[in-house]
């Protein structure tokens, strides 16, 4: 049996005069250093443990534990592919519109590393959503129907499935089937999230209007903020806020000097707050509703 685990290392190669090395040269040096690190570390590990070089990422976004995306190189600095784990592009319970905007941002950053181009793409995409230019099929979410729920009235697609069964008893959704739905405008406040969704066919037949903004607050905002929070200092629109942000970070570092985990957590919250204000607040979005 061979058990494996990963150890990520960061290298910042410099010239003798202290100038940071970038591009393909930095990538080549990093690969060689990583190979050497593995060989040296193995000498100090108890057999049969062995630390071997596997891959190098450039660029690389580490969102959280087991959630990352980057361009993967092995030994050839001219040959790479995109590699990701645990990001929204892998989730089945997100609407296609989420994958379109998130995937578009990732593509731009991974291919050209042009943060400003990614920001422009994001703003235009959000505008298209708010202007209701996104087709209905891009808003469809699907979730599997289970046999039992402890609180069925709080499970949106279960509420919808029951409603569909009452409308057409002969075609009531069965356990295990995937229920497609779209968030709709209700014209009044509703308590249950299940009352804010409908089947795509029913929407078309009855001329109902999709609630586009909920897709921003409930599915798009969080993952997109996590990306830009990591490159906040590189955003041109952040320039005027930078000094105030740095003061806040120093304050948090002093407050949580004995708790690194809490310090990182609160700094990331501060980063996300700035991204939200810079990219999302101007959209006049509703308060996010709880997801099920």
Task: Please provide the spans of the model-predicted regions.
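DNA-dependent DNA polymerase catalytic subunits
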Residues: 1-4, 11-292
């Amino acid at each position: 049996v061979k058990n494996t685990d990963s150890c990520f290392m960061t290298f910042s190669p410099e010239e003798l005069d202290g100038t940071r090395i970038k591009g393909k040269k930095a990538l080549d040096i990093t690969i060689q250093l990583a190979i050497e690190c593995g060989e040296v570390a193995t000498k100090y590990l108890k057999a049969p443990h062995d630390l071997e070089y596997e891959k190098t990422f450039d660029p690389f976004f580490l969102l959280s534990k087991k959630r990352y995306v980057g361009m993967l190189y092995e030994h050839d600095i001219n040959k790479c592919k995109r590699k990701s784990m645990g990001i929204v592009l892998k989730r089945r319970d997100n609407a296609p519109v989420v994958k379109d905007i998130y995937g578009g941002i990732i593509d731009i950053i991974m291919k050209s590393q042009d943060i400003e181009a990614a920001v422009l793409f994001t703003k235009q995409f959000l505008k298209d959503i708010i202007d209701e230019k996104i087709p209905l099929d891009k808003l469809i979410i699907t979730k599997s129907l289970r046999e039992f729920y402890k609180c069925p009235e709080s499970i949106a697609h279960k509420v919808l499935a029951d409603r569909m069964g009452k409308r057409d008893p002969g075609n009531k959704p069965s356990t295990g089937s995937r229920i497609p739905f779209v968030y709709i405008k209700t014209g009044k406040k509703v308590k249950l999230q299940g009352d804010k969704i409908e089947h795509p066919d029913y929407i078309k037949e009855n001329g109902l209007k999709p609630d586009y903004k909920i897709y921003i607050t409930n599915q798009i905002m969080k993952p997109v903020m996590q990306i830009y929070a990591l490159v906040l200092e590189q955003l041109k629109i952040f320039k005027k806020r930078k000094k105030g942000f740095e003061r806040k970070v120093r304050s948090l570092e002093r407050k949580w000097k004995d708790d690194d985990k809490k310090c990182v957590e609160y700094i990331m919250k501060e980063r996300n707050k700035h991204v939200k204000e810079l990219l999302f607040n101007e959209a006049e979005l509703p308060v996010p509703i709880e997801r099920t």
